[in-house]
Design a protein with these regions (language model features):
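Adenosyl-5′-phosphate
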Residues: 1, 23, 116, 174-175, ...
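Cysteine-centered catalytic environments shared across enzyme families
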Residues: 1-339, 351, 355, 535, ...
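Acidic-residue sensor for enzyme active/binding pockets
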Residues: 79, 102-104, 303, 369, ...
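Short secondary-structure boundary/capping segments
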Residues: 335-337, 379-386, 623-624
Length: 628
C-alpha cells in the first residue's frame, strides 16, 4: 500500500517539473512513510512514489520499478493477491525476477501481456505504467475502485496522483475554475461519482478503467473490466447451495488476502460483515488477532456492545475506543487533512479514529466493506422492492392512494417514495443530501443545471429481479466507491493498509450468482452472510437490526459543530464564490436547528466543502507544514 504521482509534459522536462514532482511526492508521506523513490526519462515523464512496506520489506519492493532493459516502468499502489500464481506463469514464459514483491509481478505482467494483464489481476490497485520508447503513459484502477487515481490535464502537461490535492495544487492548475455540474453532483451526493473532478480539467480514473495518454495528447479512457451484475435464473444459487458456496468463497478470500510480512488485524463492528471477516481471520491465525472497534455516546449508533460480545466469542485481542460529541471539533483538522478531495460522508469521523487505533498496533487490517452492496444488505433494497407494484399505477393514483393509507399502522403503509415520478427518482432521493427545493433556496444558480446522474437512470418497474439487479448495479458503481474512498483516505492518513476480502473478485463473481431470495428474507438483507456467520458464532449474538457505522451528526451540527457552521458557512461567502445565497443558508440552518427540517447530510456536505477548500486549495508552498 503506497502513494504514486507522476507528470507527463509536451515540451520537455525542466528542473521546475522535477522539483514539483518531488514536492507532490512529499504531500503523500502518510501514505508511505517507509520509503520514497523518483524516476524520470529526462525527456517527458517523471514519477514519484511513497511506500508503506507490507510484502518484501527490503529494497526489492522499491519503486518506481523498471525492467532490466528499461522498456517498462511502473508505480503501483495496492496489493495483488494472485501474484504468486501469475509469477509462476511468467517464470514458465521465461521472465526472471529479482525480488519477492507483488509489484515486480505487476511490472513483468504488463511487459509480457500488455494491457490484457489488467484483466488477470485479482487485487486492489491503482497504477501508472510508462514506456519510454513510445512515451505512452497508462493509468489503471481496480474494477471496484478500492484504490484511488486522480488526474489533471492540459495540452502542455498531464499530472496524476493517489490524492486529488496533488493534481490541483501544482503550478499549472487553475484552482478558481469550478465545474458547476460537478459542484451540483457533490452537493447532492456528498461525493463525486465516476470520473468526475470538482475543478475543470480534473477527474478520476473510474473503477475498472484505464487511461492512455501521450505528451500533448488528450486522455483516452477505456473500460477493461466490469463487475458481474447477475446471471440467468437457471444458473442462480439458492438455499444451502448458496450458503455453502458463499462460506467457502469468503473463507478462501480472507486467507488469500492474509499474505503479509507484517502483523495483521481487523476492524470489528457490531454487524455481520466485519465479524464474519474477523472470525475467518482468527480461525486461520496462530494467536489472538488484534480487532479494533469504535463506540459512541449515542445509543442509536453505538455498536460497542455487540462488537465486544463478538470479540469474546471469537477470542480476539480486542481494542475499543469511544468517540464523543466534544471530539468533533478536535477531529475537524484531521478530517480536512485526510480527505484530499471534497467528501461529505461523516462516518469519516469514526473511520479516522478506528484507523488511528489500529495503526498503533498493526500496519494492515481486513474490513467487511462490500457486503451490503453485494448481498442486498441496505434497508432501501427491501423498501423499493416491496413498493414496486405501486409504480405500475399513474403517479396521481399513487399520490391519492398513499394519502388514503395514512390512517393505517406504519408497517401496513407503503413507503413515502411511491409518490416520486419513477423508482429511479426515489432511489436518487434516498442518496441525496440536498434536493431540488434545497438548491432553489441555498444555491439558486445550480437549481436548474442538467444532472449527470446516468448511474441513477430512471427504470420502469419491470420484474422484481430486474429492479433488484438494477439497484445493486447502482450501488456497486456509485455508492461502493464512495465507501471505499472514505476507508482509504482515513486509513492511509494513519499509514494503515485496509484489505477488503468481501470484494475479492472471486466473491464478487459468486455474489452475482446468488439469488436475491437467499439474501432478502423477512424484511432484512444479507441473510446468506448472516447464516455464514452463524456457523462461527452463537446465532443469538448476531443482532437483527442493521446499524450504520456513523455518528450523531444531526445533533453535532446544532451543538458541538455550530461554531464551525457559523464561521465557515454563515459569516462569510462560502466557496466557491458566487454560487450560494447566504440568507437561504441561514434560513436552512435555522430550520435544521429548530427541527422543522433534517438537513444533516446537506449541511455537512456544505461544511465539508469549506473545510476542504481552506485546507487544500492553496499553492504547494505550504506542504511541508502539513506532513510534518
Amino acid at each position: 500500500m503506497c502513494g504514486v504521482v507522476g507528470m507527463l509534459v509536451r515540451d520537455g522536462l525542466t528542473e521546475a517539473d522535477l522539483a514539483e514532482v518531488a514536492a507532490l511526492t512529499a504531500l503523500m508521506v502518510r501514505r508511505g512513510p517507509d520509503d520514497d523513490g523518483a524516476w524520470d526519462d529526462g525527456v517527458a515523464c517523471a514519477l514519484g512514489f511513497r511506500r508503506l512496506a507490507i510484502i518484501d520489506l527490503g529494497p526489492g519492493g522499491h519503486q518506481p520499478m523498471a525492467t532490466d532493459d528499461g522498456s517498462d516502468v511502473v508505480v503501483f499502489n495496492g496489493e495483488l493477491y494472485n501474484f504468486r500464481e501469475l509469477r509462476h506463469e511468467l517464470e514458465l514464459a521465461g521472465r526472471r525476477f529479482r525480488s519477492s514483491s507483488d509489484t515486480e509481478v505487476v511490472l513483468q505482467s504488463l511487459a509480457e501481456w500488455g494491457e490484457a494483464a489488467l484483466r488477470r489481476f485479482n487485487g486492489m490497485f491503482a497504477l501508472g505504467w510508462y514506456r519510454p520508447a513510445s512515451r505512452e503513459l497508462v493509468l489503471a484502477r481496480d474494477p471496484l475502485g478500492i484504490k484511488p487515481m486522480a488526474w489533471w490535464w492540459s495540452p502542455e502537461a498531464f499530472v496524476f496522483g493517489s490524492q486529488y490535492d496533488q493534481v490541483v495544487r501544482h503550478r499549472r492548475c487553475r484552482r478558481d475554475r469550478v465545474d458547476p455540474s460537478s459542484l451540483h453532483l457533490y452537493l447532492r451526493l456528498g461525493y463525486l461519482p465516476g470520473g468526475h473532478g470538482l475543478l475543470e480539467d480534473t477527474g478520476q480514473v473510474p473503477p475498472g478503467h484505464l487511461l492512455r495518454i501521450r505528451p500533448g495528447g488528450v486522455p483516452e479512457v477505456v473500460r477493461f473490466r466490469t463487475p458481474p451484475t447477475g446471471v440467468p435464473d437457471g444458473e442462480r444459487l439458492r438455499g444451502d447451495a448458496a450458503l455453502d458456496a458463499v462460506d467457502a468463497a469468503v473463507s478462501a478470500a480472507v486467507r488469500r488476502q492474509s499474505v503479509s510480512d507484517v502483523r495483521m488485524g481487523a476492524f470489528l463492528s457490531g454487524g455481520i460483515d466485519s465479524p464474519l471477516v474477523t472470525a475467518e481471520l482468527q480461525a486461520a491465525a496462530e494467536g489472538p488477532v488484534p480487532a479494533f472497534t469504535i463506540g459512541t455516546d449515542d445509543p442509536v449508533s453505538d455498536e460497542s456492545g455487540p462488537a465486544t460480545a463478538y470479540a469474546e466469542s471469537l477470542g480476539v485481542e480486542h481494542h475499543l475506543r469511544r468517540i464523543r460529541g466534544a471530539d468533533a471539533i478536535d477531529l475537524l483538522d484531521d478530517v480536512a487533512a485526510c480527505n484530499t478531495e471534497p467528501f461529505g460522508d461523516y462516518s469519516s469521523f469514526p473511520t479516522l479514529l478506528v484507523s488511528e487505533l489500529a495503526a498503533a498496533h498493526v500496519k494492515t487490517v481486513q474490513s467487511g466493506d462490500g457486503g451490503d452492496e453485494l448481498f442486498w444488505g441496505y434497508p432501501r433494497f427491501g423498501k423499493v422492492r416491496d413498493a414496486r407494484a405501486w409504480f405500475h399505477l399513474p403517479r396521481a393514483a399513487r399520490v391519492l392512494g398513499y394519502g388514503l393509507t395514512k390512517p393505517l399502522p406504519v408497517h401496513r403503509r407503503p413507503a413515502r417514495g411511491v409518490m416520486f415520478p419513477t423508482v429511479g427518482d426515489w432511489y436518487l432521493d434516498a442518496h441525496s443530501g440536498l434536493r431540488e427545493r434545497d438548491f432553489a433556496r441555498i444555491a439558486p444558480s445550480l437549481a436548474d443545471l442538467p444532472e449527470d446522474l446516468a448511474l441513477f437512470d430512471r427504470p420502469r418497474p419491470g420484474t422484481e429481479d430486474d429492479l433488484l439487479q438494477w439497484m445493486r448495479a447502482n450501488e456497486l458503481a456509485c455508492h461502493l466507491p464512495m465507501v471505499l474512498q472514505k476507508v482509504d483516505r482515513a486509513a492511509m492518513y494513519h499509514s494503515l493498509e485496509v484489505r477488503v476480502p468481501l470484494l475479492d473478485l472471486d466473491v464478487v463473481e459468486l455474489a452475482a450468482r446468488v439469488d436475491p431470495s437467499a439474501c432478502l428474507v423477512d424484511g432484512r438483507g444479507k441473510e446468506v452472510l448472516r447464516r455464514t456467520l452463524a456457523r462461527r458464532v452463537p446465532p443469538e449474538r448476531i443482532p437483527v437490526p442493521k446499524r450504520g457505522f456513523t455518528v450523531p451528526m444531526r445533533q453535532w451540527l446544532c451543538d458541538d459543530l455550530r461554531p464551525a457552521v457559523e464561521s465557515l458557512l454563515l459569516d462569510r461567502d462560502p466557496f466557491p464564490a458566487g454560487f450560494f445565497d447566504r440568507d437561504g443558508l441561514r434560513a436552512s440552518y435555522d430550520d435544521h436547528r429548530s427541527g422543522r427540517l433534517d438537513l444533516t447530510r446537506g449541511l455537512w456536505n456544505l461544511l465539508a466543502l469549506q473545510i476542504w477548500a481552506d485546507r487544500h486549495l492553496r499553492p504547494l508552498g505550504a506542504h511541508r507544514a502539513e506532513v510534518a
